[in-house]
Structures are given as structure tokens and as C-alpha cells.
Amino acid sequence: MQQETSTPAAAVPSNATPAISVRDVTVHYGSVLALDGASLEIAPGRVCGLVGMNGSGKSTLFKTIMGQTRPDSGTVAVNGDDPAVARRTGVLGYVPQREAVDWDFPVSVRDVVMMGRYGQLGFTRRPRRVDIEAVDHALERVELTDYASRQIGQLSGGQRKRAFVARCIAQGARIMLLDEPFAGVDKRSEATMTRLFRELADGGATVFVSTHDLPALPELADEAMLLNRHVLMHGSPKDVLQPDNLAAAFGLDVMKR
């Protein structure tokens, strides 16, 4: 196992339960080592940007936090609970990469957002007024009210991502994992989501975002995390995004471009 050289983020009160806690997690896919003793904590009310090259383990880390991938060793807690509990109770929400979604599926934007309410529907499984209002509110927050009846695949890349963010909001998720939400999005969607993530964090939610957009990190995130199978560094974007740290995460060739 490689030695972790992470720098702690802002201090968390000793009695506060971390929103996300990962301890010495190792994951293999067959003979391929995806995570090697990864450890991290993210406090409630923070936006954290996850940075690493392709194959560094970002998606595996998210899947492990979601409980979709079982680690070979180590522990994961979400709001102090098992990830499965956090998902079942709606505490944990997830926005997948665009490649993971069938955009031709015959479902409207409103239907996608309503999926966030499924765990809270009553015995009849029919949306109640409270569910409809939650969906309306979520659509308004991501500026998609006028697109609610459109088939999801008819939206632009940025609008699609905003629809899945709205699903998390309608769900009432307090911890959100977003896998490359800014990949292939328009400037309006990027600005809308950046503003929204800050509003959600100011309201006590935790937003964990993987991104390749390094220049945008200081505006987007309270803290940044460099990953290369384990956490290389975790702290403020200014401290983390230093040339030596990025060289360790991406390799010297990247830094020379």
C-alpha cells in the first residue's frame, strides 16, 4: 500500500459526523488495482472537487461510496451509516457520467426528476401533491421548468446534467456525488450548476464533484482532492493545485503542456 500524503481540509468540530468517510479502502477489478488504501473525510456543507487522470480511480471511489462496489478492505460511511442505508433513505444522491445513461429512453424531464421521489411515494406509488411540488421546485432551481415535458434526450448536454441534479434535489439528498458534471456542457449550465452547488452547500448539503476543469476549481469548490488510486493531497484548491502536486497526480508530461 502506498503512503497517503493528504493534507487535511478545514477543521471539523470534534462532535460532527463526517458526511463522507472512507478509511483505507482498497478495490481490485480482477488483477487491476483501482484503489489502494484510499482515505478521506468530507464535512457537511462543503463542495469538494475530485481531480485525477483517467484511470486514477475516481469513478471507482464514487461507486464505492454509493455502495455499488464492495471494497476488498477498508470501510466507508455516509453520514455515519452504511452506504446502502444512505441510499435507501434518500440521503445520498448521484449524478452519473453521460455515457452511463440511455438518452433514447422514452421518458420526460419531469419523469427523470420524479424518480428522485420514488423512495418516498406511498402505497399507491402515485405522486402526491408534496411530490409534485418537490419536482416543480427542483426544476425551477436548475432552470428547466420550461423543458419539463420534453424527452430527456432532446436536451443539450448541460441541460441533461441539470435534470439529474434536479433529481437529487427532489429526492432531498444531503450528500451528492457528481461524476464529471461539467463534461461537454454549455457555459450557462456550468454557471448554473456552480451557483447551485454553492447554494446547496450553504444550506448544509455536501457536494462531491469529479472534474478535469482545474482552472474552475477555486470558484467551484471549498476544497480539492488529488487522487491516483489513493488520496495524494486534500485541502484548499490553492494549496492542492500546486505544480508539484499536479505533477504527482498527472505526471510531468501534463505539466509541460
List each model region and its residues:
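Helix-to-loop junction immediately C-terminal to a conserved catalytic motif
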Residues: M66
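H-loop (His-switch) and adjacent beta-strand-loop-beta switch element
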Residues: E223-P237
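Conserved ABC ATPase signature
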Residues: Q151-L155, Q159
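Conserved ABC transporter NBD signature motif
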Residues: G74-R88
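Conserved ABC ATPase "signature" region
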Residues: M114, R128-Y147
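Catalytic Walker B motif of ABC-type/P-loop ATPase nucleotide-binding domains
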Residues: M176-E180
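The feature captures the beta-strand-to-loop junction immediately N-terminal to the Walker
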Residues: V51-M53
